[in-house]
Swiss-Prot record:
Protein name from the UniProt record: Imidazolonepropionase
Native species: Salmonella paratyphi C (strain RKS4594)
Places the protein is found: Cytoplasm
Gene field: hutI
Cysteines engaged in disulfide bonds, as pairs: none
Record CDD domains: Imidazolone-5PH
GO cellular component: a single term: cytoplasm
Entry keyword set: Cytoplasm, Histidine metabolism, Hydrolase, Iron, Metal-binding, Zinc
Length: 407
């Protein structure tokens, strides 16, 4: 019988879906195990017969399923207002160009967010964050991008920092100043990119407000040359990069981001084989965002089979935002990725655990249940991981553990 050291906490009588690729079973499943936690990290995973049955720091989970904490690696969580009215207009036949001419589209969210007090933005974002936490999310990426000016971009990143300070969920903040051209630069997008590169990135990086730089390389966003200026600026400062690419057309954005060893290429509906090969060579994760595909009623699906063939890691995220994916649910995104894009449930699980961790540069500490990894995990009233993917409207979460503490 193994003796527990003082300060150790044990979860026993569990079915572990470790998501460890070194384990042969689907989902890295192992039965009749015990998880030993100390100081916020997993010390060991051992057969439960090696440990005492009961004690002050022993939690008997009665055979429940345990998985790594979920990771939502692509969200636009901090914003004000909503775009419900323009969604109704679109369904009644209005074009995006018509809506934009009336002040709608992303600029409507930018205007509302610029005008919103920081404390109000914080309260709005906190409610959304806790919704994701209630689904078992323990690591969350938050992008800026609804300021499109230095002061408001900084305000959004300060909100993300305030959320992180609550110590309820890990936050990975991303600067997405190159999200769209603001109205005041409508006729000078190159001038706006100069502002992003010469002012926003260096000043906000110096303040320690973000972990990575993102951009929107698209026909309705920024072209390849403008996008490369952003990537060059970030890389010169040693900042990891990522990109919204190939969502609505094939511009070569995935190849561009991969050339800069981007953490991830996101959306990728129009990705071609050359882009997939570049992602493999650049170590870039493909992030699927089925909520936007569904909400925009797109028809071009990401090349999932090509990604499999080239062994490119595939993550899945909510893309929660007011304009194209108003779905604050990672469970729903997992289901959509299977139904719409043809992922298997196991691939969807990998997409919100170990591959999502890689998309945030956290693969050495998050996304798997292994000795030395962070003790972020979820106990479910379920027998199999597929149950969480199969029925997204039902949340069988029993217990969420963050940094070794029940939360």
């Amino acid at each position: 019988m193994r003796q527990l050291l003082p300060g150790n906490t044990v979860w026993r009588n569990i079915r572990l879906a470790t998501m460890d690729p070194q384990r042969q079973a689907p989902y890295g499943l192992v039965d009749n195990q015990a998880l030993i936690v100390r100081e916020g990290h997993i010390c060991d995973i051992v057969p439960e017969t090696q440990l005492p049955v009961s004690g002050d720091n022993i939690h008997d989970m009665q055979g429940r399923l345990v998985t790594p904490g979920l990771i939502d690696c692509h969200t636009h969580l901090v914003f004000a207002g909503n775009r419900a009215a323009e969604w109704e207009q679109r369904l009644n036949g209005a074009s995006y160009q018509h809506i934009s001419a009336q002040g709608g589209g992303i600029n409507a969210t930018v205007s509302a967010t610029r005008a919103c007090a920081e404390e109000t933005l914080y309260l709005l974002a906190r409610e959304r964050m806790m919704r994701l936490a209630s689904e078992g999310v323990t690591l969350l990426e938050i992008k800026s991008g609804y300021g499109l000016e230095l002061a408001t971009e900084e305000k959004l990143l300060r909100v993300a920092a305030k959320l992180a300070a609550e110590n309820a969920i890990d936050i990975s903040p991303t600067l997405l100043a190159a999200h769209a051209t603001p109205a005041e630069y409508r006729d000078d997008p190159d001038g706006y990119i100069t502002l992003v590169c010469e002012t926003m990135i260096p000043q906000l990086w110096q303040k320690g407000l973000f972990d990575a730089v993102d951009l929107f390389c698209e026909s309705v966003g920024f072209n390849v040359a403008q996008s490369e200026r952003v990537l060059q600026t970030a890389k010169a400062l040693g900042i990891p990069v990522k990109g919204h690419v190939e969502q609505l057309s094939l511009l070569g954005g995935a190849q561009l981001v991969s050339r800069y060893q981007g953490l991830s290429a996101d959306h990728i509906e129009y990705l071609d084989e050359a882009g997939v090969a570049a992602m493999r060579d650049g170590g870039t994760v493909g992030v699927l965002l089925p909520g936007a595909f569904y909400f925009l009623r797109e028809t071009q699906r990401p090349p999932v089979e090509l990604l499999r063939r080239y062994q490119v890691p595939v993550a899945v995220a909510s893309d929660f935002n007011p304009g194209t994916s108003p779905f604050c649910s990672l469970h729903l995104a997992m289901n959509m990725a299977c139904v719409q894009f043809g992922l298997t449930p196991e691939e969807a699980w990998a997409g919100v655990t170990r591959h999502a961790a890689r998309a945030l540069g956290r693969q050495a500490t998050h996304g798997q249940l292994r000795a030395g990894y962070r003790a972020d995990f979820v106990v479910w009233d379920a027998e199999q991981p597929v149950e969480i993917v199969y029925e997204p409207g039902r949340n069988p979460l029993y217990q969420r553990v963050y940094r070794g503490q029940i939360s």
